Swiss-Prot record:
Residues annotated to bind GTP: 30-34
Record GO terms (molecular function): GTP binding; magnesium ion binding; uracil phosphoribosyltransferase activity
Activity control mechanisms: Allosterically activated by GTP.
Family of this protein: Belongs to the UPRTase family.
Highest taxon of the lineage: Archaea
Protein name from the UniProt record: Uracil phosphoribosyltransferase
EC number(s) given by UniProt: 2.4.2.9
Enzyme class: transferase
Protein's GO biological process: UMP salvage; uracil salvage
Function field: Catalyzes the conversion of uracil and 5-phospho-alpha-D-ribose 1-diphosphate (PRPP) to UMP and diphosphate.
Entry-linked HAMAP family: Upp_A
Positions contributing to 5-phospho-alpha-D-ribose 1-diphosphate binding: 80, 105, 140-148, 209
Annotated gene: upp
Keyword terms, alphabetized: Allosteric enzyme, Glycosyltransferase, GTP-binding, Magnesium, Nucleotide-binding, Transferase
Amino acid sequence: MPLYVIDKPLTLHILTQLRDKNTDQINFRKNLVRLGRILGYEIANTLDYEIVEVETPLGARTKGIDITDLNNIVIINILRAAVPLVEGLLKAFPKARQGVIGASRVEVDGKEVPKDMDVYIYYKKIPNIRAKVDNVIIADPMIATASTMLKVLEEVVRANPKRIYIVSIISSEYGANKILSKYPFIYLFTVTIDPELNNKGYILPGLGDAGDRAFG
């Protein structure tokens, strides 16, 4: 199961600031950008590369690495909380093509939210995904019930990309298992796995509503 939990001291330091209810909007966004960049570098470790030889300014020749897949990246932004996260990913993958998906869960006021809640896609603009060539990165800071992500994955899997990556900051144990049991070939990168969901489908302990905290 390709689950990558990037729980290193720096990522956990940034995560702690994101969880803190006293972190203001500006610093919340900045920290999402920082984690996006770090997680992008972690993804780069799994991409295809070639051994190449170059000549230095001193006339010496030496071997190095050319990550060929850097030219074959598509990043999909799940609005709106993923915007700062994608900004960070683009620092790692400046040549990436970008797509945007707007999705919303169907809620009934005053009622508990089922874990298999309905989700509808209200906006979609995705560049052409080249089958077995492109590496698609789907960004969403929070994977709770995974209902939104599974809806987006229906769109992406049909295109048959080379690899599919999911980038999140916090994933619930329930959501991560649900995604990887249905799509065991997907690479899920997250900073931490949180154990619980409340009756509204939010992750506990979590960090609140990432979109509201980033943009108001």
